Design a protein with these regions (language model features):
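N-terminal topogenic module of multi-pass integral membrane proteins
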Residues: 4-76
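Membrane-interface helix caps and helix-loop-helix hairpins in membrane proteins
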Residues: 8, 73-76, 124-136, 180-187
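Residues within membrane-spanning alpha-helices of integral membrane proteins
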Residues: 18, 51-58, 113-117, 143, ...
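Internal transmembrane alpha-helix with an interfacial aromatic "cap," most often the third helix
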Residues: 25-39, 64-111, 204-207, 211
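Membrane-interfacial loop-to-transmembrane alpha-helix junctions, especially the N-terminal start
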Residues: 40-56, 104-115, 156-167, 214-220
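Aromatic-anchored segments of alpha-helical transmembrane domains
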Residues: 56-63, 116-127, 166-179
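Membrane-proximal helix-loop-helix units in multi-pass membrane proteins
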Residues: 79-150
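C-terminal transmembrane-bundle signature of multipass membrane proteins
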Residues: 151-220
């Protein structure tokens, strides 16, 4: 009984950390949704993809909170949403940072092709049983695009600082902390969620800041 109680306690701690992460991402979705509503029609495909980049981790974290707190049978759905966040959400944010930093105004069909391409490469590497390697490559590439987008605004410092802060938290969470086992008395997945919680608001701030400093648009 004691072991079962301890397991439930740690399960509830993960539900709590997932819930806090979901709330942080949801706040980002609300704020970015205002940008989408006020954007010009040609800018809305980009803002839609940015919103998707935050909505996927918000959904994954919300389902995770319910899974670890109430309904363990939601594990499959939670895993699917978590993979979508990794293989689709973060890359979309990296591409958005690139387009904003370079002042590129990609049209809806361009964003559609990028979405389809990400889905196609996911299926390809799944068939090749190389998803772990592809995930690492995709996430590191996305973080580099975020940093590049911030660097393109130099000598304005804030975009680069935001990109460094968000990327640093994501790298530390993914490569150092991980999600399996414990770090002292703390479950690693809870610490992982705690690091992602400030990372996503920093990413939202970066997107808004890059959009505000965009001075011209090159239509592709």
């Amino acid at each position: 009984r004691l072991c079962r109680a301890q397991g439930l306690s740690m399960q509830y701690s993960t539900a709590l950390s997932d819930g806090v992460l979901a709330l942080a991402c949801l706040i980002c979705v609300v704020q970015l949704g205002k940008r989408y509503a006020g954007a010009q029609p040609e800018q809305r495909p980009r803002w839609f993809c940015i919103l998707l980049g935050f909505a996927l981790p918000a959904a994954a974290a919300a389902v995770g909170a319910v899974r670890f707190g109430l309904l363990p049978e939601l594990g499959e759905l939670h895993g699917w949403l978590s993979r979508a966040s990794s293989f689709l959400g973060l890359p979309l944010l990296g591409l958005a940072a690139l387009s904003l930093g370079r002042n590129w105004q990609w049209q809806g069909p361009t964003w559609g092709r990028l979405l389809l391409g990400l889905c196609a490469f996911f299926e390809l590497f799944r068939q090749l049983d190389r998803l772990d390697e592809y995930r690492l490559f995709l996430q590191l590439s996305s973080l580099l695009l975020l940093l590049y987008g911030g660097l393109l605004r130099w000598p304005q410092r804030r975009p680069l600082v935001l990109a460094l802060g968000a990327s640093g938290l994501l790298v530390f969470a993914g490569l150092v902390v991980g999600t399996d086992g414990f770090l002292g008395p703390v479950r690693r997945i809870d610490l992982f969620h705690a690091l992602l919680t400030p990372a996503y608001p920093l990413l939202a701030w970066l997107m808004i800041d890059l959009a505000q400093t965009q001075s011209r648009a090159n239509t592709l």
